[in-house]
Amino acid sequence: MSVACVLKRKTVLWQDSFSPHLKQYPEGTLNHNMPVVLTSGPVGQQQPPQPPTHSALATGPHASPVGGSMGVAGRSQDDAMVDYFFQRQHGEQLGGGGSGGGGYNNSKHRWPTGDNIHAEHQVRSMDELNHDFQALALEGRAMGEQLLTGKKFWETDDSNKDGPKGIFLGDQWRESTWGASDHSVSQPIMVQRRPGQGFHVSSEVNSVLSPRSESGGLGVSMVEYVLSSSPGDSCLRKGAFGPRDTEGDENEKVDKKNKGVYEGDKLGDLKEEADSMDKCNGLPVQNGIDGDVKDFSRTPGNCQASASEVDLLGSIQNGSEGLVQLTNNNGAKPVEDFGGIESQSVQLDPMEHVGMEPLQFDYQGNQVPVDSGAAAVGLFDYNSQQQLFQRPNALTVQQLTAAQQQQYALAAAHQQHIGMFSAGLAPAAFVPNPYIISAAPPGTDPYAAGLAAAATLGPAVVPHQYYGVTPWGVYPANLFQQQAAAAAAASNSASQQNNPQSQQGQQQVLRAGGNQRPLTPNQNQQGQQTDQLVAAAAVNSALAFGQGLAAGMPGYPMLAPAAYYDQTGALVVNTGARNGLGGPVRLVAPASVIISQSAAQAAVAAAAASANGPAGTANGPFRQLNSQQPQGQPQPQGNQNLASSSFYGNSSMNSNSQSSSLFSQSSGQPGNSSLGFGSSGSLGATLSSALGGFGTAVANSNTNSGSRRDSLTGSSDIYKRTSSSLTPIGHSFYNGLGFSSSPGPVGMPLPSQGPSHSQTPPPSLSSHGSSTSLNLGGLTNGSGRYISAAPGAEAKYRSASSASSLFSPSSTLFPSSRLRYGMSDVMPSGRSRLLEDFRNNRYPNLQLREIAGHIMEFSQDQHGSRFIQLKLERATPAERQLVFNEILQAAYQLMVDVFGNYVIQKFFEFGSLEQKLALAERIRGHVLSLALQMYGCRVIQKALEFIPPDQQVINEMVRELDGHVLKCVKDQNGNHVVQKCIECVQPQSLQFIIDAFKSQVFALSTHPYGCRVIQRILEHCLPEQTLPILEELHQHTEQLVQDQYGNYVIQHVLEHGRPEDKSKIVAEIRGNVLVLSQHKFASNVVEKCVTHASRTERAMLIDEVCTMNDGPHSALYTMMKDQYANYVVQKMIDVAEPAQRKIVMHKIRPHIATLRKYTYGKHILAKLEKYYMKNGMDLGPMCGPSNGII
């Protein structure tokens, strides 16, 4: 496939190595299918044709030129420039280089056309051709002046005599990237024409010129390349992707080489070839119907068509007839259905074909109603689309100057690669946006209004290359707002435009859209009139759209783009849309854009100059940072009443009305100071509470560092949060984002930030598909006061918006808008999106105020509960109150929750006395149930611990256990509550517990939980309360000391009891030391007796061990080798007085050799070794061997 591309007036014929149907020709045979390089260099510099297997594209980072290829020195710098132009990411490899046809679809789609949305209509994906173009080697720019005389480079010449001519004459990319070049072709200037004048007629001013401007023609070249290799190409029509008849191909090409370009024979051949493939999908191929006939003259100022062109297109003289002819091929309704709209005579440009692409836009002439937000709405009515371009009340060029200047003033600092802008300059010269591709005004398809989008939108905010998705039909969400603003600003003279001028301007839009010409980054003033006129026609269509909707007329469908950026910066793409269905409809930001004061003043001055009338700043599309919008402006009724420029307005406005908001307020009604639309308009009541101020107040950063995120830094306090508002989600991470009463474009810094700020959106903006992780803006309740910005917090305010309007919550066409995190955003795990993101560490610096509305959910989550606990410890009283207000009503639910109970406990620890008492009131009536519950018992314990005991609520809580003491004592949870009651409550209030223990002391002492309660009673109760308990204990001492639980009660008495109680227990032990010491549980009691008994009682117990005999051995020997009793012997050695200790050691000496055989005997020897070494005594024969075996 040979394709010709003009790059900044340089011509190159190159062979696509990705085309599998090409064959390799022998060296020396010059054929148009081979790469022919034209040069003005010396004759004789013969370069052999490069075979297809080695025609690697030189621009790719992994491609390298081979010997004799087109590569030259300085290629790496040009590669960097090409990468800069086309945003190729590092590491992206050109797929299929040198591999024949196997390389298709191996690389990322960089210039997708959207054709792959309709797979059944796809002939050849434009992505592949665009990818090939992107990989084209841009090695040089010098072509000489050989094309300036009008010579066609595709004509036959004797180039084989002079050898190949190379255009790669060295590196000439030294000047500014988008700067002035030598005689390049720029965007043709589109100006208004007199009626009946064709586009191809050259006249003084009213003609289409292609002058030698000072701006690059890169965009023209790109579209030339894309369209020349479109599916309408005869090569593809005949060969598609399959193998071709090589011989026939060669004969065909050689035959064509000997003919003139526009000869009638060739034109006939082209038509025959086109007819053979036009119906490849059962649909006529309109775009590129004569693909080989070049429609654009490369010679500056030469736009005359040849006779063949006139013969080909001369029959189309009436614009409406031509449009009907094109649209009816798609099965559209005849134009007679819209008889109410006058049909003007429109002459189509014979240079460029106008028509829809049936490969992509195969839509039926009907609307598809849907009743859910997830379903797409078929909103492009291609049958009545022409009517939008035949409205008589078009706008003039000058009326869009104000909106353009305001938009450029706001986004000037965002053009990072354009050096002419600075922070404080007013927008004097307009620089069109880089590569705005087919953004669509209302009522048109995305292919037909790329220029209109550029005129109304201004510089692009977020490059579509960042997301790697198809950019066709993608536009920022404030496109509607800007169009409506421009329409209202120019509405005072819209009705005064004559019909011929309107039709001329609309022709221009249609013509430009049909040719699919993307805008290049540096079109100069010559393209400004084009932008202005195109914008005027776009706003005219918006007016017609608004009028039709307000009047309820049929045939005015709503706009549903295939993809666009919503107000949060999220790219909404409906990839699953079927034929006839557009994308999901999302609400756009309704209010004005905040700009700096200097830029606002410049914009106001420009608006006043363009509108020739009073221009107010209050209701304009832009507002100053330090200005407040007035409460309302009366709109007097006039004789010339037009429909409101609002898209969804039903109010009647004077021609001098200053309101240019998206949602205009009704006449004479006061507006809302915090919103851009009135509360009494068609959508005011509903959207006031549903939408709120979904604004993005980007901080006015003054830093000039080139960091990737410096456009969202928080170095300014202009947007400091007021006391009545709450910081939105993500404020801690993007701390430069705050509240604003009027939303603006996401990611667009203010002009004072300078050109160094990055256009790259935050990383989280593309991580969740159609919704981002950043909640920008606040929520208002309809009166201008901010309410909680947390997800779900708007639910209780939605009841106020019950009006049955288009955007009401009950509407099936447009679901009501909600915040980024709503209570209905439930993830598959059952958690809300906010909690899920928090659990995934997406909010490392989340604050309590940012989860308002989700406190209950967080409290019942493991990580969320821990987060709240940690925050409550250091929270301010206001933050604690915020949390407390949400948990109070459901306090009992949290008290019995596995994680929520900890939040309640934290309030008992760190909350105010009022909060503690309020929670205690929630416990009242549920003490027993909570005491027996695993988690509720902990809450009651905290309440008993931290509420002052003199509070009446404590006594009331404890009294609820009366009659259920034993049940609670024997319960694994309730016993802790009873213990805490005994510890914290005044003993006088616990008499009912003592009374309940009567005759139950032994049973409770041997109970695993009751024994603990008995010990607490012995520790904290009054002596008169513990006496009956001790009496019962003494009666069962012998049994209790051997019980696995009762022994703890006896030990507790020995440790904390009165001396007389200890003596009673020691008396029970004497005489049974040997037996009890060998008992697993009683041995512990014997140890406590030796430790806590008096000196006399201790000596008696030790003497009993030393003098008692156990059969042939002494009791001491038996105890030393016993697994339990040896600890009693060790304790005796430790606590015995020196004289008695010496006696014990002399008793142990005869058994040293034997004790070494026993595991437990070694413990005794180690104890002896310790004392003898400590005291320096010589053990004599008692000592072990020198190696110190222990």
UniProtKB/Swiss-Prot annotation:
Keyword presence, Glycoprotein: no
Coiled coil (UniProt feature): none
Entry's localization field: Cytoplasm; Cytoplasm, P-body; Cytoplasmic granule
Post-translational modification: Phosphorylated. Phosphorylation takes place at the time of dissociation of cpeb1-a from pum1 and the translational activation of ccnb1 mRNA.
Biased composition (Low complexity): 491-508, 518-531, 628-675, 765-777
Record-linked PROSITE patterns: PUM, PUM_HD
SMART domains, sorted: Pumilio
Residue span, PUM-HD domain: 830-1172
Gene Ontology terms, MF aspect: mRNA 3'-UTR binding
Region feature (Adenine-nucleotide binding in RNA target): 865-869, 937-941, 1011-1015
UniProt keyword list: Cytoplasm, Phosphoprotein, Repeat, RNA-binding, Translation regulation
Gene Ontology CC terms: cytoplasm; cytosol; P-body
Residue ranges of the region described as Guanine-nucleotide binding in RNA target: 1083-1087
Region (Uracil-nucleotide binding in RNA target): 901-905, 1047-1051, 1126-1130
Repeat positions for Pumilio: 850-885, 886-921, 922-959, 960-995, 996-1031, 1032-1067, 1068-1103, 1107-1146
Name of one Pfam family that matches: PUF
Complex and partners: Interacts with cpeb1-a; interacts with unphosphorylated cpeb1-a but not phosphorylated. Component of a complex with papd4, sympk, tacc3, parn, dazl and cpeb1.
Domain notes: The pumilio repeats mediate the association with RNA by packing together to form a right-handed superhelix that approximates a half donut. RNA-binding occurs on the concave side of the surface. Pum1 is composed of 8 pumilio repeats of 36 residues; each repeat binds a single nucleotide in its RNA target. Residues at positions 12 and 16 of the pumilio repeat bind each RNA base via hydrogen bonding or van der Waals contacts with the Watson-Crick edge, while the amino acid at position 13 makes a stacking interaction.
Function: Sequence-specific RNA-binding protein that acts as a post-transcriptional repressor by binding the 3'-UTR of mRNA targets. Binds to an RNA consensus sequence, the Pumilio Response Element (PRE), 5'-UGUANAUA-3', that is related to the Nanos Response Element (NRE). Mediates post-transcriptional repression of transcripts via different mechanisms: acts via direct recruitment of deadenylase complexes leading to translational inhibition and mRNA degradation. Also mediates deadenylation-independent repression by promoting accessibility of miRNAs.
Protein name per UniProt: Pumilio homolog 1
Taxonomic lineage of the native organism: Eukaryota, Metazoa, Chordata, Craniata, Vertebrata
